[in-house]
């Protein structure tokens, strides 16, 4: 489908209160294209309100959420809660827009659901394409504008009355659908590759658990008790400190001055770039001067990275970085050059091990792990033939994950370049 799309650059614009738009487009207020309504929170003291079948969405459910549609959040409510608390069930296709810090997270209701009071939801009128509105709100221009018009200095909030008066560029429903179709093509590809990666990751981690935690393939072998691990392990397997077989390094202080970000092309990974899956998806960028002045190390592609300090430490995220990079000092790195056939064994090991380690973190204001806390942890080392066999089984899975991730990054770059040009009419979709 993508290769059959025909675009053209728009050449005829008209001046409006929101700037230049194509001469055949309109400007409409949100209140003219849909109903704006909020949600609420049932009393948490009444157990009968919670654990039902009705999805209840909060802004937290949209944090780091990259899909267009959402069907449910962390919690559900009951019919009793809806009736007694005057909650509204929003229909499929409703635009869910967060109105409190953070302002501007957006998704589309995949099915009927409810939200808390941290949303200003838009129920589009007939003929209005939900996906077009979704992509419009995803632009940096709209996101920043919504924050600018939100009242409150300490706790900014986008009021419903304010949102209703927001003016937006409004193409015909047919063109709205064309724009949404082109952009959702990229998002569909991205979602499919993400789902592939989730399945591949699950297979690899299950295999690791089966072999090196449950020891299922080795049940018939002789087992011996190991003091360091406080459990029985197959005879002939070694137990070593993690620091005895590899080096864990800390990232560098983050540059602050603008001079270090001019003509920046070197990926700089921060805590915010860590993800729940295998691969880092994005980064900030610094330049060669920052690399030199801060004595930063440039790590190799496919190195392993994880958090060692910060508020989100207990999420215990461990990632592989599919490109060369440097990292902030809140992160720890194991360079891929020292991993060889242990690469994916160590990655899987850390996925399980880090969860245990973070429960003993120090620091009340800012939880942190020392590098020594990690390097002094005892781990099991299987015989080389077993390690090589495991590597041969999971390497194709991880290589596919990494290749998928590289494709996702390219797809996102193309989508993000097209997004503002399409929704603001600079680029027109002629044919699909």
Curated annotation (Swiss-Prot):
Disulfide bonds: none annotated. Coiled coil: none annotated. GO terms for molecular function: DNA binding. The keyword DNA-binding applies. It holds the Pfam family Methylase_S. GO terms for biological process: DNA restriction-modification system. The type I restriction/modification system is composed of three polypeptides R, M and S. This is Type I restriction enzyme MjaIX specificity subunit. It comes from Methanocaldococcus jannaschii (strain ATCC 43067 / DSM 2661 / JAL-1 / JCM 10045 / NBRC 100440).
């Amino acid at each position: 489908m993508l290769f059959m799309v025909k675009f053209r650059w728009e050449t005829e614009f008209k001046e409006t209160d929101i700037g230049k738009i194509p001469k055949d487009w309109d400007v409409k207020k949100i209140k003219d294209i849909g109903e704006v309504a909020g949600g609420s929170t049932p009393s948490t003291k009444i157990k009968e309100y919670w654990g039902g079948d009705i999805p209840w969405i909060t802004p937290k459910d949209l944090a780091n959420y990259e899909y267009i549609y959402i069907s449910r959040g962390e919690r559900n409510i009951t019919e009793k809660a809806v009736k007694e608390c005057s909650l509204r069930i929003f229909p499929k296709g409703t635009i869910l827009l967060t109105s409190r810090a953070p302002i501007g997270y957006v998704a589309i209701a995949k099915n009927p659901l409810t939200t808390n009071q941290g949303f200003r939801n838009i129920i589009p009128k007939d003929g209005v394409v939900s996906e077009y509105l979704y992509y419009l709100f995803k632009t940096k221009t709209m996101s920043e504008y919504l924050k600018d018009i939100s009242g409150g200095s300490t706790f900014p909030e986008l009021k419903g009355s304010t949102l209703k008066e927001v003016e937006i560029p409004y193409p015909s429903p047919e063109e709205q659908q064309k724009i949404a179709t082109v952009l959702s093509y990229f998002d569909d590809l991205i979602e499919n590759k993400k789902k592939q990666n989730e399945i591949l990751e699950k297979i690899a981690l299950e295999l690791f658990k089966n072999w090196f935690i449950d020891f299922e393939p080795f049940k018939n072998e002789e087992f011996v008790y190991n003091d360091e691990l406080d459990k029985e392990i197959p005879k002939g397997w070694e137990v070593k400190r993690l620091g005895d077989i590899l080096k864990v390094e800390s990232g560098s202080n983050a540059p602050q001055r603008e001079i270090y970000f001019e003509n920046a092309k070197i990926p700089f990974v921060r805590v915010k770039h860590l993800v729940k899956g295998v691969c880092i998806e994005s980064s900030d960028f610094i330049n060669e001067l920052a690399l030199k002045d801060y004595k930063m190390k440039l790590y190799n592609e496919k190195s392993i990275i994880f958090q060692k300090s910060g508020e989100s430490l207990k999420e215990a995220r461990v990632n592989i970085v599919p490109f060369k990079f440097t990292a902030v000092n809140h992160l720890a790195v194991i360079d891929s050059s020292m991993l060889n056939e242990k690469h994916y064994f160590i990655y899987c090991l850390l996925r399980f091990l880090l969860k245990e380690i973070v429960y003993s973190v120090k620091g009340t204001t800012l939880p942190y792990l020392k590098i020594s806390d990690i390097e002094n942890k005892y781990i099991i080392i299987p015989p080389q033939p077993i390690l090589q066999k495991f590597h041969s089984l999971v390497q194709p899975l991880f290589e596919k994950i990494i290749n998928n991730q590289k494709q996702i990054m390219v797809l996102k770059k193309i989508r993000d370049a097209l997004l503002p040009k399409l929704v603001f009419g600079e680029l027109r979709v002629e044919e699909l």
